[in-house]
A protein has these predicted regions:
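Non-heme Fe(II)/2-oxoglutarate
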Residues: 1-75
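Fe(II)/2-oxoglutarate
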Residues: 1-3, 135-137, 148, 208-213
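Short, solvent-exposed loop/turn segments at secondary-structure junctions
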Residues: 13-15, 118-120, 132, 171-174, ...
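Conserved double-stranded beta-helix
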Residues: 41-54, 65-125
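Catalytic core of non-heme Fe(II) oxygenases with the double-stranded beta-helix
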Residues: 94-165, 202
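A short hydrophobic beta-strand segment most commonly corresponding to one strand
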Residues: 115, 167, 183-198
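Short beta-strand His + acidic residue motifs that chelate non-heme Fe in jelly-roll/DSBH
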Residues: 173-182
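Double-stranded beta-helix
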Residues: 191-213
Length: 213
């Protein structure tokens, strides 16, 4: 993995924009659905999915299209399209308990962008050292049920503040999301991108839907 695994852009949104988006999420709290991690393996959080965003939160969709995507394309060095699964191509995710988060994994799409709206519980995105991401590229899923083994390896932690943007090469960088504090919440806008014209791998898409929603 010779390329940089991620880019952390601080203060991508102004405080006023961040506050406005936070209020918007609260106004639409009735859309949130609890994801418990099917079979104990999938991620745990509350979510507003892409179909709901498209219908009810056009400003969240517009942020991804007009401001996030150009920066992700610059980071990628190539034109990109939205991930092929409309429900998962954009999401609002909220983590409010220590057990909520993502275990170590690789994404089914090459690039993902996280816009932090609130981080009141010391939420982090952690990356395995690049050498270990290379070594474990094809072993990550056999090891998926025992994430504590991967947690013994060297890693880097990124803590984003409100308004920050984190762009990742999620398909090659093994990473996880953790909630470190027992109080507060973390609100993320998540935008997933694929190479222009690329269609998702049907098998990986099926696995993702089984583990997610």
């Amino acid at each position: 993995m010779s390329q940089t695994a991620y880019l952390h852009v601080e203060h991508f949104l102004s405080p006023a924009e961040t506050s406005s988006f936070g209020a918007l999420v609260d106004e639409h709290a009735g859309l949130l659905r609890e994801i418990a991690g099917r079979g104990g393996l999938g991620p745990r959080y509350r979510v507003i999915d892409g179909d709901q965003i498209r219908a009810m939160l056009p400003s969240v969709e517009g942020l991804g299209r007009e401001r996030v995507r150009p920066l992700v394309e610059r980071f990628a060095g190539e034109p990109l399209g939205a991930f092929g699964s409309p429900r998962r191509a954009q999401r609002v995710q909220i983590y409010s308990r220590p057990e909520q988060g993502f275990r170590w994994h690789r994404d089914g799409h090459p690039y993902v962008a996280l816009v932090t709206i609130e981080n009141g519980n010391a939420g982090q995105t952690q990356f395995l050292a690049p050498a270990w991401s290379r070594i474990l590229r094809y072993l990550i899923y056999p090891l998926y049920p025992v994430p504590q083994l991967l947690s013994l390896l060297p890693r880097t932690a990124v803590t984003c503040g409100p308004g920050d943007l984190l762009i990742m090469r999620g398909q090659v960088a093994i990473h996880r999301g953790v909630t470190l504090a027992a109080i507060g919440r973390r609100i993320l806008f998540v935008y997933a991108f694929d190479r222009d014209g690329h269609r998702p791998n049907p098998l990986r898409d099926l696995i993702a839907r089984r583990l997610n929603y």
